[in-house]
């Protein structure tokens, strides 16, 4: 993208803050559905960073594959499992949290040191023409039939997943004869030699 340097810096800061905030929400939120949606926000932020690097095809692939396939697959898995039990508290969970925070801080320190000590060279190459337009033209001219077949296949998979997710659990059917028959009345025992009064 041919943007001014100030616009690129501001866009990078916004996308980086959005990505880091969404990633923290994925880890800290207890609701799995919210975590899945925030994971989609992380993927979209990464796609925006690819756009700033003039990698438009990689950005489109990021959105199509990770947001459109992986994230949707995670959401369908959550809906199909439909587990409503709360997580059991873990004894001394603060030790695990402290260890995780220490590892994350160490990785962040290593990456920061690498970024600050590396002599980055500013590229003066002229950006080439966008390749995603050429790929789109090929999709709708030379490869139109495979493209449409793939879209129909994905549509069938989506409809099947929706049907499975919206299915209703019916109770077990009772025996069909129980509603039409009466239980048999127990017969009274009659001593031997005594006539039945009904006779």
UniProtKB/Swiss-Prot annotation:
Annotated TM spans: 9-29, 32-52, 61-81, 102-122, 143-163
Coarse class of the protein's main subcellular location: membrane
One cellular-component annotation, GO: transmembrane transporter complex
InterPro entries the UniProt entry points to: NADH_UbQ/plastoQ_OxRdtase_su6, Nuo/plastoQ_OxRdtase_6_NuoJ
Location in or out of the cell: Membrane
Membrane topology: Multi-pass membrane protein
Pfam families: Oxidored_q3 (PF00499)
UniProt keyword Cell inner membrane present: no
Reactions catalysed: a plastoquinone + NADH + (n+1) H(+)(in) = a plastoquinol + NAD(+) + n H(+)(out); a plastoquinone + NADPH + (n+1) H(+)(in) = a plastoquinol + NADP(+) + n H(+)(out)
Highest taxon of source: Bacteria
Any one GO molecular-function label of the UniProt entry: NADH dehydrogenase (ubiquinone) activity
Listed EC numbers: 7.1.1.-
Keyword terms: Membrane, NAD, NADP, Plastoquinone, Quinone, Translocase, Transmembrane, Transmembrane helix
EC category name: translocase
PANTHER family, per the entry: NADH-UBIQUINONE OXIDOREDUCTASE CHAIN 6
Family: Belongs to the complex I subunit 6 family.
Function: NDH-1 shuttles electrons from NAD(P)H, via FMN and iron-sulfur (Fe-S) centers, to quinones in the respiratory chain. The immediate electron acceptor for the enzyme in this species is believed to be plastoquinone. Couples the redox reaction to proton translocation (for every two electrons transferred, four hydrogen ions are translocated across the cytoplasmic membrane), and thus conserves the redox energy in a proton gradient.
Protein name: NAD(P)H-quinone oxidoreductase chain 6
Species this chain originates from: Leptolyngbya boryana
Gene: ndhG
